[in-house]
């Protein structure tokens, strides 16, 4: 298969994932029409965005896996991918420690606000990065990148699980 055909196949897969996510969100919007959607439009919009990201993230695993299969013969790609995945997983660990760290003396600082926004975004996307690392680890052609990708998967999963348990524990009634 030619390189252009491979790129076209992967691009078509991502377009299909986008179309599927858009269709699911459209069906969800149609199913939840009513006064609540009108009155609480911003909250419904945020929920629709999260639904889109979730469906697209899951559907995009297929073209992502296909692209990785096409890139299997290139060891330098796998070296860079696995090291980058480890670095990115380390940012999840850093975010976790910033989340559980004690509050600063000035609670309304701009740095804390930006850190909270970045931490929330990082937490929401963490399962998708973990799943992507797992798919890459399964497809990896050699042992070294596979192990690095599995470590990145474990870091992403453990950080997301810890944050989720922290949220559940804090919401629990006394």
Task: Give the location of each predicted region.
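Alpha-helical transmembrane segments of multi-pass membrane proteins
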Residues: 14-32
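Perimembrane loop-to-helix junctions flanking transmembrane segments
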Residues: 30-47
């Amino acid at each position: 298969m030619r390189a252009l055909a491979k790129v076209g196949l992967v691009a078509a897969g991502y377009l299909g994932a986008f179309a599927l996510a858009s269709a699911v969100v459209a069906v969800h919007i149609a199913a939840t029409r009513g006064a609540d959607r009108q009155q609480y439009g911003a909250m419904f919009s945020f929920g629709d965005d999260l639904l889109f990201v979730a469906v697209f993230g899951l559907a995009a695993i297929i073209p992502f896996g296909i692209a990785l299969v096409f890139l299997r013969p290139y060891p330098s790609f796998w070296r860079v991918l696995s090291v980058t995945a480890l670095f990115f997983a380390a940012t999840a660990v850093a975010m976790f420690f910033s989340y559980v760290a004690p509050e600063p003396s000035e609670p309304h600082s701009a740095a804390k606000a930006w850190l909270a926004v970045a931490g929330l975004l990082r937490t929401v996307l963490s399962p998708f990065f973990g799943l992507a690392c797992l798919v890459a680890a399964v497809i990896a052609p050699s042992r070294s990148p596979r192990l690095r990708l599995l470590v990145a998967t474990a870091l992403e999963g453990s950080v997301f699980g810890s944050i989720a348990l922290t949220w559940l524990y804090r919401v629990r009634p006394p």
